[in-house]
UniProtKB/Swiss-Prot annotation:
Keyword DNA-binding attached: yes
GO molecular function, one term: DNA-binding transcription factor activity
Name of the protein described by the UniProt record: HTH-type transcriptional regulator ArgP
Protein keywords: DNA-binding, Transcription, Transcription regulation
InterPro entries referenced in this protein's UniProt entry, alphabetically: ArgP, ArgP_gammaproteobact, LTTR, LysR_subst-bd, Tscrpt_reg_HTH_LysR, WH-like_DNA-bd_sf, WH_DNA-bd_sf
Family to which the UniProt record says this protein belongs: Belongs to the LysR transcriptional regulatory family.
Cross-referenced PANTHER family: HTH-TYPE TRANSCRIPTIONAL REGULATOR ARGP, TRANSCRIPTIONAL REGULATOR
Native species: Sodalis glossinidius (strain morsitans)
Top-level taxonomic group: Bacteria
Domain HTH lysR-type as annotated: residue spans: 4-60
Subunit note: Homodimer.
SUPFAM superfamilies with a match to the protein in the record: Periplasmic binding protein-like II, Winged helix' DNA-binding domain
Annotated CDD domains: PBP2_IciA_ArgP
Length: 293
């Protein structure tokens, strides 16, 4: 049986986390040559490449499996052996969860457990991929099916409303939200792969993707600010703008129409006791504040 030296696995992990050999060497306090040598030893052991040497580097399928193994072992070692330093807990989460329910959910964990969070923000359609690559030990995703050797539980749903300020609505939709009016109304997306706004308009107004002018802003909080100041219309989780809706700073442009995103919590199996506490905290709070119907 091939048993890797965990020093070599840590070198592979550092190259992925630090997005290159130079920063990995600095992180491990060794030379770049030593980092390369350790990874080459690991590749020789398994008889195949474990790292695709692009910029930034990324692991091969076998490399992903080894990184997942390393992260599981680190969690289990922390549980049984303890440590003088907080354990790094890397999670892939979507920006809207981070802006709404996730941090309150993690409050008891951060208060009671010796951990350091490394939250990697990614669209909820792509967070599971980071878990598959071994970059994180847990992920909030819209995918209901678990990866091999992983566990999954349903958290609940975020309902997205199509909103704008009253002044924006008066300017762009004086006769209501129509197909022709939408073609002139500036919108906003999180990144070039964020298709929620386009999907909503295509489904409800038969507008083809790319037909609506759209800003790109990588911030959930900025969506709210842009909408409040009257410069865009956009899809925002109801949970994030309850106060703004109540005070009429924002209005629902299409009452009765919304986009629902069911969220799931994925993590490696078996869970350490520490990871089980993280799971319990996320599920307990998620079931309280997210839609369960």
């Amino acid at each position: 049986m091939k048993r890797p030296d965990y020093r070599t696995l840590q070198a592979l992990d550092a190259v992925i986390r630090e997005r290159g050999f130079e920063r990995a060497a600095q992180k491990l306090c060794i030379t770049q040559s030593a980092v390369s040598q350790r990874i080459k030893q690991l590749e020789n052991l398994f008889g195949q490449p474990l790292l695709v040497r692009t910029i930034p580097p990324h692991p091969t399928e076998q490399g992903q499996k080894l990184l997942a193994l390393l992260h599981q072992v680190e969690l289990l070692e922390e549980e049984w052996l303890g440590s003088d330093t907080p354990l790094l807990l890397s999670l892939a989460v979507n920006a809207d969860s981070l802006a709404t329910w996730l941090l309150p959910a993690l409050k008891p964990v951060l208060s009671d457990l010796p951990i350091r969070l490394n939250l990697q923000v990614e669209d909820e359609t792509r967070t599971q991929e980071r878990l598959r690559r071994g970059e994180v030990v847990g992920a909030v995703s819209i995918q209901p099916q678990p990866l091999p050797s992983c566990l999954v539980d349903r958290l609940g749903a975020l309902d997205y409303l199509f909103v704008a300020s009253p002044s924006f609505a008066a300017r762009y939709f004086p006769n209501g939200v129509t197909r022709s009016a939408l073609l002139k109304a500036p919108a906003v997306a999180f990144d070039h792969l964020d298709d929620m706004h386009q999907s909503f308009l295509q489904q409800n107004f038969d507008l083809s993707p790319g037909s609506v002018p759209c800003h790109i802003v990588n911030s959930s909080e900025a969506f709210v600010q842009l909408a409040r100041q009257g410069t865009t219309c956009c899809m925002i989780p109801h949970l994030q703008i309850e106060r703004e809706l109540e005070q009429r700073e924002l209005i629902d442009l299409t009452p009765g129409l919304y986009q629902r995103r069911m969220l799931y919590w994925h993590r490696f199996a078996p869970e350490s006791r520490m990871m089980r506490k993280v799971t319990d905290a996320l599920l307990d709070h998620g079931h309280q504040v997210l839609r369960q119907d």
